[in-house]
Amino acid sequence: MAVPKRRKSRSNTRSRRSQWKAAKTELVGVTVAGHAHKVPRRLLKAARLGLIDFDKR
């Protein structure tokens, strides 16, 4: 494993960490029981099978 040769300052560490951004989940349209909904792609199959209750949202 790589070991840093010298200590990294707190400001350098935090600015390096701040470059990371979470990606937005892409929503896909799905029609369940005649109603159109948008769900993330990973939940598409569950939505089609009726495992997600859309009335709570």
UniProtKB/Swiss-Prot annotation:
SUPFAM superfamilies: Zn-binding ribosomal proteins
Region described as Disordered: spans on this chain: 1-22
Keyword set, alphabetical order: Ribonucleoprotein, Ribosomal protein
Gene Ontology biological process: translation
GO cellular component, one term: large ribosomal subunit
An annotated Gene Ontology molecular function: structural constituent of ribosome
Basic residues composition-biased segments: 1-19
One of the Pfam families matching this protein, by short name: Ribosomal_L32p
Family of this protein: Belongs to the bacterial ribosomal protein bL32 family.
Protein name: Large ribosomal subunit protein bL32
Organism annotation: Mycobacterium tuberculosis (strain ATCC 25177 / H37Ra)
